[in-house]
Swiss-Prot record:
Official protein name in the record: Probable GTP-binding protein EngB
Binding site for Mg(2+): 41, 63
NCBIfam families: GTPase_YsxC
Role this protein plays: Necessary for normal cell division and for the maintenance of normal septation.
Gene3D superfamilies: P-loop containing nucleotide triphosphate hydrolases
Domain of life: Bacteria
Lineage summary: Bacteria, Pseudomonadati, Pseudomonadota, Gammaproteobacteria, Vibrionales
């Protein structure tokens, strides 16, 4: 039984400084991560058709907390702290990096990771580290090459192919697609990917209902 997920009903639950302050490790979580200027907040707002679900900031690096959003029962989106921006003090960068690594390596309910990279500057060192962390934990990764509207169609396709070729080195399940919050490029594909990752939550519901019917 396929379930229609209403992403527009997504709402904020809580913020946490680290994994220990998050709610119980249960259900299914899909995490969004990216450099501080990769357009992560804009992508979340476009995905959910909401203008201010994730707060955008003109000062990259302001999002220092792990933000949790409820999509459906037992389905959550996690907005991880932006990373790697020059204006952020080194100690804070180290703290965020530790927080990211800990979340990816220890959070059992994490079923997929969306990594956002500016299509003009993809695969920076810390982007690659993030993907390797996920692959090491057998977590599937969707790379979104954001701000795709900044390139003409031919250049956009060439860049996607280039990053797809590079992504082979990661091993694991890593997909690469172009994305634009402004023009809506790749939004339907992203929703389809999240539908796939969230699907087991509804299979559990169906099994529970069947058990009740049997009783």
């Amino acid at each position: 039984m396929s379930k229609t997920i209403h992403y527009q009903k997504t709402h904020f639950i809580t913020s946490a400084p680290d994994i220990r302050h998050l709610p119980e490790d249960e259900g299914i979580e899909v995490a969004f991560a990216g450099r501080s200027n990769a357009g992560k907040s804009s992508a979340l707002n476009r995905l959910t058709n909401q203008k201010s679900l994730a707060k955008t900031s003109k000062t990259p690096g302001r999002t220092q907390l792990i933000n949790l959003f409820k999509v459906e029962e037992n389905c959550h989106i996690v907005d991880l702290p932006g990373y790697g921006f020059a204006q952020v003090p080194l100690e804070m960068k180290k703290k965020w990096q530790k927080s990211l690594g800990e979340y990816l390596q220890k959070r059992q309910c994490l079923q997929g990771l969306v990594v956002l990279m500016d299509i003009r500057h993809p695969l920076k060192d810390i982007d690659q580290q993030l993907v390797f962390w996920a692959v090491d934990q057998n977590i599937p990764v969707q790379i979104l090459l954001t701000k795709a509207d900044k390139l003409k169609s031919g250049a956009r396709k060439a860049q996607v192919l280039k990053v797809r070729e590079a992504a082979v080195d990661f091993g694991g399940e890593v997909e690469v697609d172009a994305f634009s919050s402004l023009k809506g490029i790749g939004v339907d594909k992203l929703r389809a990917k999240l539908d796939e990752w969230f699907a087991p939550a509804f299979e559990l519901d169906d099994e529970f209902i069947e058990d009740l019917d049997v009783e």
